[in-house]
Amino acid sequence: MKKIFFILTAFVSTIGFAQNDITICHTSATDKFAVFASNKDFNTDHPSPLAYVHESEAGGEMIKLKTATGMEANAYLIKAKTKTDNWVFVFQEWWGLNDHIKREAENLYNDLGNVNVLALDMYDGKLATDPQAAGKYMGEFKQDRGTEIVNGAIAYVGKSAKVATIGWCFGGGQSMQASLTAGKQAVACVIYYGMPEGDVERLKTLNCDVLDIWPTKDGWINKDVTEKFEKDMAAAGKKLTVKSYDADHAFANPSNPKYNKEFTADANKNTLEFFKARLK
């Protein structure tokens, strides 16, 4: 038993500290990213977010979503001024559905025009204000519950809805998973430095194009991860556009010391163009 414990411990440590060699077989994309939660360097790269209280000018409000198990989910909703089937699902960073994400949701709402925006609470009400709590919540997250929340959101928006997804960091991976879950209703997927799906057979079921915002200095979603994603998408016969920036992980977060205003503006421009071309 002691030998088995040692082997498992060494395996986890190798994953946590050798991101340049991430080749975890038969491990879900969500679990791969969750390994980072226990890595001190990853925690250091994510300093506590600045205090911010969002006051919506677009009528944003928290709502409850029904799910298949009966356990309700939370979401932040901004409804279009004119009825439309265009929806954008927004996915949080590892902090949770905080006011920074609500602000990003409202920015998308304002920039895209006639669209509904739904930011999903993947932590069921838990919010982190420091890396230790964020790592704990991300490590505890179960993809089954995440998929349940997304299915609840899809049921809420209806069968005629066209669903685009976007997320950052932890939420980047969840954006990918949500687009896979949405099936034929998925029309666009944007990933900001998140863990992509690595199962080619799953990728073959994807119904939309993907825009991957990738910072080349990212030590977590690194070159090996990105190049594998490109190969996997090609093997699945799906369209992937990678926009690379000479920046570090979380460069688009204004609360991060490595925030790059110029690159963030360009990434946002590419994101809006990508969405507008597919949300018609």
Language-model features: locations:
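Short alpha-helix in the alpha/beta-hydrolase fold that links the catalytic acid
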Residues: E104, N222-D232
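Gly/Ala-rich beta-loop-alpha elbow adjacent to hydrolase catalytic centers
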Residues: G167-G171, S175
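A conserved short beta-strand
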Residues: K184-M195
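Acidic catalytic loop of the alpha/beta-hydrolase fold
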Residues: K217-I221
